A protein has these predicted regions:
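N-terminal lobe of the biotin/lipoate ligase/transferase fold
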Residues: 1-85, 89, 107, 151, ...
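Acidic (Asp/Glu) carboxylate-rich active-site/surface patches
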Residues: 84-117, 127
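Active-site beta-strand/loop microenvironment that shapes enzyme catalytic pockets
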Residues: 121-131
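Cytochrome P450 core scaffold surrounding the K-helix E-X-X-R motif
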Residues: 131-140
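Structured alpha-helical
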Residues: 145
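Conserved, helical-rich catalytic subdomain that frames metal- and/or nucleotide-binding sites
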Residues: 149-172
C-alpha cells in the first residue's frame, strides 16, 4: 500500500501533526521532519530531537478489534528489521517500544490510537538516533553511525522504514 509522504522542516511533533491530519480526513500517510521541537516519548517523557536524526510518524487505519500489544510488537519488529540492513550488530527490543544496541537506546517508538468518524487509526512515532545521541541522565543512548564504516543519511533510513510499512500494513 502506497503511503503519501509529508515533509516538514520544523514541527512540534510528528505524532501531533499526524493527529491533526487524521482530524482533517486523512486516513494514512508518513510524516518526516528535519527538526522536532516538542517530541515526546512514552508516559509523556520528552524526546530529545537532535538535528540530523530521524523523526517520523506513520499513520493508518486499523481494525477496531486489533490487539494494540500485538501492533506495538509488530511495529517495533518492522523498524528493527529496517535498521538491521545498515549494521551488523544485534538490535534488541526493550518492551514495550525501545530498540537497543549493547543496552543503549538507539530508537524510540511511540504508538497512539485515534478514533475519528467511526474509524480507528494508529499513529506510530519513530525516533532514530542516526548521527548523534542525546545525553540523558540515567539512560544510556547510542546512534546508528557509531556502528557503520560508511556514514548513513537519515533519508536512506527513512526510505527503508517507509518501504517496510508500505509493504506490511495491508496485513493488519
Amino acid at each position: 500500500m502506497r503511503l503519501k509522504k509529508y515533509y516538514f522542516k520544523r514541527i512540534k511533533s510528528t505524532n501531533d501533526q499526524a493527529a491533526q491530519m487524521i482530524k482533517k480526513g486523512k486516513e494514512k500517510g508518513i510524516i518526516i521532519a528535519d527538526l522536532q521541537i516538542k517530541g515526546r516519548g512514552q508516559y509523556g517523557k520528552k524526546w530529545i530531537s537532535q538535528k540530523g536524526n530521524l523523526f517520523m510518524s506513520v499513520f493508518y487505519k486499523i481494525n477496531k478489534e486489533k490487539n494494540l500489544n500485538f501492533l506495538t510488537n509488530y511495529n517495533c519488529r518492522l523498524v528493527k528489521s529496517a535498521l538491521k540492513k545498515f549494521i551488523n550488530k544485534k538490535i534488541t527490543i526493550k518492551p514495550p517500544n525501545d530498540l537497543l544496541i549493547n543496552n543503549k537506546k538507539l530508537c524510540g517508538i511511540l504508538q497512539e490510537t485515534i478514533f475519528f468518524k467511526l474509524n480507528k487509526l494508529i499513529i506510530v512515532g519513530i525516533g532514530v538516533n542516526i548521527i548523534k545521541s542525546p545525553n540523558v541522565k540515567g539512560y544510556k543512548t547510542t546512534f546508528l553511525n557509531d556502528f557503520t564504516a560508511k556514514k548513513i543519511n537519515k533519508m536512506i533510513v527513512f526510505k527503508s522504514i517507509s518501504k517496510l510499512f508500505e509493504k506490511n500494513i495491508r496485513f493488519l
